[in-house]
Structure formats: C-alpha cells, structure tokens
Amino acid sequence: MLSQLPLFAGGEIVRGFGRGSKELGIPTANFPLEVVKSLPESLPTGAYYGWANVDNGPVHKMVLSIGWNPFYNNKEKSVETHMLHDFNCDLYGQTLKICIVGYLRPERSFDSLESLIAAIRGDIEQAKAFLDEADKAKLKEAPFFTEKLCSSK
C-alpha cells in the first residue's frame, strides 16, 4: 500500500549478485534479507525513488527496486538501491539509509538486457524530476539521515 510512503529503512550494505555494475552499468547497494523482510508486506514490488545516504554522509537522490527481479528469476526478494552519485570505493559493510518517497512502476520481466537498462534509465530521469519538487526535496533533510540506527536483537 503506497499510503505508507515516505518509508524509512536502513542497514548494512551486503554483496548482491554483482549484476548492477557489471551487466547493467548501474551499481546498486543491497540490503541483507532481514532488512528486506522488515519492509511492509503490503508494499508493492517494483521501482521506487527517494533519498539515500551511506554512513551518515551526504544525502543523494536514488532509485530502487523491491522484488524478485523477474528478468533474472531471483528466488529471494531483494531491495537494490542505485544512488545518483559516483562513489570511488566499495560500500560493503557500510550503513545505507533510504527514504522511499514514491512509486515509479511495477516490476516486470524484459525482452532483453537493453530494454531493462532503458527502463532503469527512464526511472532515473523520472526520479530526478520528482525529487526536485519541493514537497519531496524537503525529505532529504529528515533527521533519520543523521541519527544512529538501532539494531533489534
């Protein structure tokens, strides 16, 4: 249900399948399964946009995928975040915080890798425009991005 947006989540960045950078040219930061499972089950799978930061650093625009990535026939649900910023290092082990602001489209399979890449590039362009709107831009300043995450044990 999209009425739950904006939605905040955070956790350690873990290794994914390695497809984002290598196959797609669109690197992603991936959450561990426990963070994925902590998201509301009623949240539709698909592409979203919002804000993200790493280790309480600067907040950047982002797009993310929530789901099973039908093009790749994933067996487990994943959350893969692509920040619209070039990082010059691996982010594994660092803390990723996200604010999911809006929904772009449902997940689906694609006929080719090229059509998947084109769809993601379109998502990125839409996200840039939406996040420039004042009501969405203000979420970049949410205290969540500078607060320490508490782990539940």
UniProtKB/Swiss-Prot annotation:
Which EC number applies?
A: 2.7.1.26
Alphabetical keyword list: ATP-binding, Cytoplasm, Flavoprotein, FMN, Kinase, Magnesium, Metal-binding, Nucleotide-binding, Transferase, Zinc
What Pfam families is this protein classified in? Flavokinase
Catalytic residues at E80 (nucleophile)
Catalysed reactions, semicolon-separated: riboflavin + ATP = FMN + ADP + H(+)
Q: Which InterPro entries match?
A: Riboflavin_kinase, Riboflavin_kinase_bac/euk, Riboflavin_kinase_dom_sf
Taking the first listed entry, what is the main subcellular location of this protein, grouped into a coarse class? cytoplasm
> Does this UniProt record's set of keywords contain Metal-binding?
yes
Kindly provide the name given to this protein in its UniProt entry: Putative riboflavin kinase
Q: Where are the transmembrane segments?
A: none
The free-text note explaining how the cofactor binds reads: Zinc or magnesium.
Q: Does the keyword Magnesium apply?
A: yes
Function summary: Catalyzes the phosphorylation of riboflavin (vitamin B2) to form flavin-mononucleotide (FMN).
GO molecular-function annotation terms? ATP binding; metal ion binding; riboflavin kinase activity
Q: Which GO terms describe its biological process?
A: FMN biosynthetic process; riboflavin biosynthetic process; riboflavin metabolic process
Quote the record's binding site residues for Mg(2+): T28, N30
Highest rank taxon of the organism: Eukaryota
The record's listing under SUPFAM superfamilies reads: Riboflavin kinase-like
